[in-house]
């Protein structure tokens, strides 16, 4: 698996860069596929715009932000990290991420007061949160901002970034994209923490993080 998902030096736009996984892995998972809308802040992460108006994210910047996010999150006590996904496709990736890292997953609806009301039985007091989509997970983002909790967010071209402290530019709507991104983030955090060697992958492939669509 290390050869299949290991770091790779590639030339993009005339520059040689080292990516956390081979470029074709990012591309086949659709991590670079944005939307037909791009907010002002997200323009800095755009590689090009297709003739049909679809914004394409710059994989180099995605890769760079994944490294930054992993180093940042590795500094926190795992039990004080909360990862959130209201949307269905992000729920299994979040659960797998939390299983490996040892943090708390909140999937499905975010109950009001989760981060702000200590009298509630579901109250949680994290030191940092990771959200899968700032729009869908806006309740978590808003409450974290009110409490001064840093927010790391997987952010697509159409997302606004108010109250987001660290943006990771990705396709945050695709099953395969979310699986690969959370897999990479998990691996890099564990490497930063010294829990796995720098040249070692997770025991499961990214597909294990992917939401499974039920066939009827």
UniProtKB/Swiss-Prot annotation:
Keywords: Ribonucleoprotein, Ribosomal protein. This is Small ribosomal subunit protein uS2. GO terms for cellular component: small ribosomal subunit. CDD domains: RPS2. It comes from Hyperthermus butylicus (strain DSM 5456 / JCM 9403 / PLM1-5). The keyword RNA-binding does not apply. GO terms for biological process: translation. InterPro entries: Ribosomal_uS2, Ribosomal_uS2_arc, Ribosomal_uS2_CS, Ribosomal_uS2_euk/arc, Ribosomal_uS2_flav_dom_sf. Belongs to the universal ribosomal protein uS2 family. One of its GO terms (molecular function) is structural constituent of ribosome. The keyword Isomerase does not apply. PROSITE patterns: RIBOSOMAL_S2_2.
């Amino acid at each position: 698996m290390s050869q299949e998902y290991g770091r790779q030096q590639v030339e993009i736009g005339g520059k040689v860069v080292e990516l956390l996984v081979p470029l074709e892995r990012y591309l086949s998972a659709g991590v670079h596929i944005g939307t037909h809308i791009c907010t002002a802040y997200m323009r800095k992460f755009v590689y090009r715009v297709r003739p049909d108006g679809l914004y394409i994210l710059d994989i180099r910047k995605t890769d760079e932000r994944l490294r930054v996010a992993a180093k940042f999150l590795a500094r926190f006590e795992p039990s004080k990290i909360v990862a959130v996904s209201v949307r269905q496709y992000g729920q299994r990736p979040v659960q797998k991420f939390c299983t490996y890292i040892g943090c708390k997953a909140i999937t499905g609806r975010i109950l009001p007061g989760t981060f702000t009301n200590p009298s509630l039985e579901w109250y949680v007091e994290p030191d940092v949160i990771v959200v899968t989509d700032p729009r869908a997970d806006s309740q978590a983002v808003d409450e974290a901002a009110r409490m001064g909790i840093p927010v790391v967010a997987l952010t697509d071209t159409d997302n606004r970034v108010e109250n987001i402290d660290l943006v990771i530019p990705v396709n945050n709507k695709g099953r395969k994209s979310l699986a690969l991104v959370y897999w990479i983030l998990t691996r890099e955090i564990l490497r930063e923490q010294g829990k796995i060697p720098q040249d070692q992958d997770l025991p499961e492939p990214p597909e294990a993080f992917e939401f499974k669509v039920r066939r009827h």
